[in-house]
Amino acid sequence: MTDSTYDVTRVRTYLQGLQTRIADALGALDGTPLATDTWQRGPAERLRGGGCTRILEGGRVFERAGIGFSDVAGDALPPSASAARPQLAGRGFEALGVSLVLHPRNPYCPTVHMNVRMLIATKPGEAPVFWFGGGMDLTPVYGFEDDARHFHQTCKDALDPFGAELYPRFKQWCDEYFFLKHRNETRGIGGIFFDDFSEPGFERSFDLMQSVGDAFLHAYLPIVERRAELPYGERERDFQAYRRGRYVEFNLVFDRGTLFGLQSGGRTESILMSMPPVANWRYNWQPEPDSPEARLYSDFLVPRDWV
């Protein structure tokens, strides 16, 4: 967080363009265009503003793909946003960002999440305070080391122009953030995560956010192209549904974006579009020793240096 010099219009224009570019690329890959759901909140509602949700369900490649843009404002930062910044509690805010979660149909094709956002906290008589956040992370059902290395290398390449120290810092942040404490396991193989970022000022921070957003298709599409047509059976789909249960647990219990949206009176359909279309839970299930399912736990659901 830093001084009050910023340009929301440029950020908004970039984010709307990013959503369109990603939606067009995913629609072309799947063969099904993503539907558009534009929404607006009235000036008297708890949360003002609006957004656009691009959504695909039941596609050839993607069982569910959701990309949301929102630009909303409220009278008081919700607890999930001000807990680490008590000096900002009670301030008004504007939050704008793009968030996506893609759940492929093929169990060999990993789920992915990406988010880039800007928040501005305001208080009459005081300078506004802004910061950026975002990142991307990969959640495989069946792990492939080539995919993990490619994803992390692309993340590193996006950050390196802004300082060689940022990738290891944001990678560790991601490993620690996307962790299910009650399961004692990571959600996936991580990636990068950052929040409260404005150290270099608006221009450089905005450039970094754009670099992360622009890297997403390069990080993920080659993996989809390698894995989406691999043959699979009922066993793999069953394990996929089981692992998706972990995704649900994290998003509803720990995810700050989900909590921010629900606590601030956000649009529930857009907030919960990250949920997988099918998930299941089993009592005390364990994978067979030395199986591909066991390898996910031993080789991938532990923090590793992938690059």
Swiss-Prot record:
Gene3D superfamilies referenced in this protein's UniProt entry, alphabetically: Coproporphyrinogen III oxidase, aerobic
Catalytic activity of the protein: coproporphyrinogen III + O2 + 2 H(+) = protoporphyrinogen IX + 2 CO2 + 2 H2O
Binding-site residues, a divalent metal cation: H103, H113, H152, H182
EC identifiers of the protein: 1.3.3.3
Keywords, sorted A to Z: Cytoplasm, Heme biosynthesis, Metal-binding, Oxidoreductase, Porphyrin biosynthesis
Primary residence: cytoplasm
Pathway in which this enzyme or protein is active: Porphyrin-containing compound metabolism; protoporphyrin-IX biosynthesis; protoporphyrinogen-IX from coproporphyrinogen-III (O2 route): step 1/1
Cell compartments where the protein resides: Cytoplasm
Top-level taxonomic group: Bacteria
Cofactor(s) required for function per UniProt: a divalent metal cation
Keyword Glycoprotein: no
Residues binding substrate, per UniProt: S99, N115, V116, R117, G265, G266, R267
Active site: H113
MF terms in GO: coproporphyrinogen oxidase activity; metal ion binding; protein homodimerization activity
Record-marked site positions (Important for dimerization): H182
An individual GO BP term: protoporphyrinogen IX biosynthetic process
NCBIfam families named in the record: PRK05330.1
Subunit relationships: Homodimer.
PANTHER family: COPROPORPHYRINOGEN III OXIDASE, MITOCHONDRIAL, OXYGEN-DEPENDENT COPROPORPHYRINOGEN-III OXIDASE, MITOCHONDRIAL
Family under the similarity heading: Belongs to the aerobic coproporphyrinogen-III oxidase family.
Role played: Involved in the heme biosynthesis. Catalyzes the aerobic oxidative decarboxylation of propionate groups of rings A and B of coproporphyrinogen-III to yield the vinyl groups in protoporphyrinogen-IX.
Protein's name according to its UniProt entry: Oxygen-dependent coproporphyrinogen-III oxidase
Species, as recorded: Burkholderia orbicola (strain MC0-3)
